[in-house]
């Protein structure tokens, strides 16, 4: 497996895993109204997470409004992230693929900020799983910034 650059796409490492999971389409992105902005042109890069399955989080209006507002700004970039199902989580751990956004498949750790929209407390453990998959320390004191 090739190691992706810190801010580069992990799709080359993710794609071979997709035939081995249920509903792989939820991880490929490219939906109507999805936005992929120039990474280098953005001053601030947001990863917006809905910590539940793609089909639950995609229609969330709050997350989509924030996604649109941030991407309307010339200085900002926002991409979406959802919880992965256990089948892909196991493969990601086995193959060293970090948690990623569905828009450009960049690792969550490459973003400046991470926003999370919870609809229930059940999403808390999914956030912890995503942080762990991303290699982001759970405790703020253990992070660089």
Please give the residue ranges for each predicted region.
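A short, structured N-terminal alpha-helical element that caps or precedes a catalytic domain
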Residues: 1-145
